[in-house]
């Protein structure tokens, strides 16, 4: 086994996983480059402080609500098709913000692309679990979490540069144009590199029924996670 093969095997860099990592970079870069400056953009468009507060509240709410449809569509369509749908939804929101420079249009568009990470997380974790053997799944999740930090660091810097060069209104709109184009690149990579998911079609419509399928350890983890996040927000 060559050093390249050992490297690929150690980090679990299967073809679908590599595509997922590129998607995390491209979509995440567009998301962080534009989304972080939405409050500034709202104020520049005359939305006022209340619109900024509403945007932040909507972001927290959608982060919770989007998780279930994200999981349902991932089970129903398969992770590959679900990721395509999620990207198209986000790109629709980007287009609304680009084409209609009004604070109300920004709020409407934001409903499509806010909390993309929460919406896509179930499909992402399903892809990792089905693409990698049991002994490499933790490594796959770790690499994905690490790579996601790259756009988190670079996105706001690039967005800030655009605002500095072109002003608050034009700079933010250009950031959304870049986010849309990066979404297109991500779609192309998904179709070319991610393998089809053949285990799809069965999806539970009622979240309450999922509780009885959980092991005791998973139930304990869920309860502890809820309590920790509640304490974190206090």
Indicate residue ranges for each PLM-predicted region:
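Cytoplasmic helix-loop-helix junction between adjacent transmembrane helices
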Residues: 111-148
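C-terminal membrane-cytosol helix-exit motif in multi-pass small-molecule transporters
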Residues: 180-199
